[in-house]
């Protein structure tokens, strides 16, 4: 490690151990350190100015004394020091309800409230109901009724109170005196305790409590005051808050009593006070002594920067832990010590809607007791979300009954401890623990302009840097061969470094007299490098394993906050030998989010260690959820600011381009060490596909995010086709995350999906090399006529349906216009799955397009998303954009081997066209195939020298071997060996992408996959698909065609022209909130252990029912009609029926739903008896049910939207009027509630004996769960007779209509079936009215 690099490190402000201050990322101190908070003070609001000239009549004063509220009046008008209040807020921690100072935790307790304000603390909680007619209540208790202009909800105008109650009449009667007293107390306590935005109004909340004066004197006004102070401190400590209110006078008095920072000196003591009409001295609380003349000679009064720096350097002797001496307590009024028995109670403090916990067990030194390491506390953060907004009439005593019960038991929860005999030692166990969990430094270490205040922390930073450099220099000398010359040079270097430090820090003390401080304050959390160099093992191409110290990489190392106990070097990264028996310590997030190189190295070591030593379910023990959350949050902030196409330019540097990784963590570790870690002269561009298939996709992605946060201008992560919900749900990443994080897996998966959407789509290196995962894209101007083109296709389809003379000829595709780099700026990339229709198609093009040997640019109709482009397009794109090379990914060798027109990928790269390189960086992929089926491919990465980019240097990689053992998170065997006669259904675009295998570099072929997605960031409504080729039945009858189903030869989708396009204005207002909402609906628990997906497909010989969402289909044509159903995770069976014998006949019927406003379409397909046997053999039952949730509205021609839908599939024996048995597929837009169903997400459960319900983001055809019903008995009369009745399959779809849309409903007095038959016979219509058409997600 270079000594010079150590001279540039900042102090770590803490906490090192984040187990206590878990909300640090939300705290104001984090924003200050990151320079996000303007250097100004908080605005302190209060409403007591209107009380200054409100005279206190002796009669009213006597009542205040009886209530125990007189002390508030006496201290309420002390001037506030805004800078001091702000500096204290920066030290307040909502997690503990204490201030974190360098000397330890300290806080305002019930003792302080009782003594300083004279408020009663031992009594019933201040709470109750607010269900009142406030005008009537004012008239009842105040004797006056406020007018409409004076009464604002539960607030009344302060001017109205002053006008009616400012002057008490002479010789008032008891009623008048009580009314005036109530008005004065109401204005005083409301102004003192509350400081909301209603500056000129007074809260009437306390008025009901003032009815009975005897009860007022018993209430615990002190605990209510402290609760409101805690709540305001917690709220103001958030990084985005700029104001504070509440009883801030109490906070300032407390600070003056206990802390030296900002504390003035009293020029003289204040004597007892008297008032005419009241015998004896008034009961002034201790806080009244600060109403004297003050001086700042001893402790200068400064601004916020000065106070902040003073707190950073505060020492233990500058804190007065026990300011209330016995002599003082003997002189103050008895009410000030009336609650001494509960000063140390651990209990909730209550004031109507506010509940905050009192934690004296964390500050026992304030009570003269020895402080030990306190037990973990839970201050119930959820309580902060409870307030009075929207609850003007609410019974708070009932809402907080549990906490009120705890307060009533306050005496039993008083803490105790051993007396503190002497000041706490610096090395006391509590202090050692505290220094690890606290935030020690608040002042940021950024550059200051000349003449600005320079915090003392800069001096300590210089000292730490010099000592660290001296340590490194000395250690390096000891490791070298020591000569006289080298020893002299080392000593000279140390002298120079010491001289520099002493020159800057002369005031810290004289070293000539030999005096040495007992311990530095504050202690810097800067850990020196470990004696043993950090090692990452690697396997070079020659086959021999070499271990290189990270410190030998030419990178300025950072110093980690908490060094790990490193395991011994391992000579084989995948070895199964026993590693260190010492458990790996969990990672902690560096304070302020400022990552260091050492921290990222620790991440690599931890991930490598856990992959060999821990089961996946224990991964969160080394990478806690809060660390992952911080990492993704910081990375997302960086990615969000990057353009769709990032540009990398440098005068002279090296760029490493990496292809698909697919969760192969250990190969990535070797790759980065082989190529050299990112630094000032080395860039990295990763071309996507970080997750899925491999067993360590999460670690791979998080490691790359760590590098991105560390070096955002040197590491660039582009998006791949597998960074989507559809792929990750199919190829294992979702299951991997849910397995590794258990109950929090759903939240982790959601965060990853949100981060995927922020990844850029492409990069341009030195203006000469274009990189993207898929490749080229079409011209954005071609999207403008999509709607007109769909209308044309729909009219042509209708003409074919009504005119049998029209030949069913396929459209001859025309070459699309090629896009340019300028078009990328118009792309909306924040989509969880790329759209396949509408005006935002470029993301799908970039992620899913493939090269072809044929010229031109065409839709990839076999896949349903992306393009195919020829060498002419490559040449044109390079020429138009002045580029030399195109580097893409998506080149899995097993899939490339299936394409005769493309070169194989076993070497890790291929030149598909002149200037077009396909790169693949996952060696020996996919890792879970059997040995005889493996391609044993090498991988590669590319090194570019910029700005020339004259040549590409291909660096081959072999797989690190052997890899640690791991199980697949997806059913790779089924995907590798699909049944030869299996044809996957293709559901509509609104169907769940979670069941979609997609990338052609995956284990099964995706060449014929039709792909559809949702744009979650824009909340766009999905158009019906028209340009994507779909395979329809060749023998659907004319009756079916009359209802809008396209003819078989057209190969176009049913389209509703008036549907909203992607990117519509209706979606523009929704982005982040809708993303989170939609994503939360798609995430669930892990799939069953079998990791298989159930697929139910009923396909006829001449009529195959298909929908439009991507499902993989075999490349080989299917010889016959299949029925394929997995039987609960066990072996599957399929039956091929002969076309001539089992042809199916379809007819349409309509259910009468006029009474409910639901239009319905029912399709009956008749089969013979064999179908029932197939279903029975496969499922073991004669009845099953599956439900799925749909999550996308469908817009029909009329413009109304369908409500979110649920699909219901069932089959059962028929009733008497139906021959034998009926299978019904139901898609009902009404919400289906079934409380008895157990939620299951993912594949078919191995045990189907219990009912279950599968919830997904969209309806899926690959149904995940069957529900056993009672097995019905067969009619024995049929026996084996050849005259068995036909089986009937009914497909019933419902579309929910608005109650006001009567024109779409079928009249109840009409025969709905007759309407259908008439419509079919007439053949005058191309399709039914939209109310009778099949919804888009159930097109047949």
Curated annotation (Swiss-Prot):
It comes from the Eukaryota. Residues 1018-1027 have a biased composition (Acidic residues). The gene is MAIL3. GO terms for cellular component: nucleus. This is Serine/threonine-protein phosphatase 7 long form homolog. Its cofactor is Mn(2+). It holds the Pfam family PMD. The keyword ATP-binding does not apply. The keyword Repressor does not apply. Maybe required to maintain cell division activity in meristematic cells. Keywords: Hydrolase, Manganese, Metal-binding, Nucleus, Protein phosphatase. Expressed in root tips, the shoot apical meristem (SAM), leaf vasculature, hydathodes and mature flowers. It catalyses: O-phospho-L-seryl-[protein] + H2O = L-seryl-[protein] + phosphate; O-phospho-L-threonyl-[protein] + H2O = L-threonyl-[protein] + phosphate. Residues 1049-1080, 1266-1289, 1318-1328 have a biased composition (Basic and acidic residues). Its EC number is 3.1.3.16. Residues 788-814, 1012-1093, 1196-1218, 1266-1340 are annotated as: Disordered. Mn(2+) binds at residues 660, 662, 773. It is found in: Nucleus. InterPro entries: AminoTfrase-like_pln_mobile (IPR019557), Calcineurin-like_PHP_ApaH (IPR004843), Metallo-depent_PP-like (IPR029052), MPP_PP7 (IPR041754), PPP_phosphatase (IPR051134), Ser/Thr-sp_prot-phosphatase (IPR006186). The active site is at 722 (proton donor). One of its GO terms (molecular function) is protein serine/threonine phosphatase activity. Belongs to the PPP phosphatase family. PP-7 subfamily. Disruption phenotype: No visible phenotype under normal growth conditions. Residues 790-799 have a biased composition (Basic residues). Residues 1203-1213 have a biased composition (Polar residues).
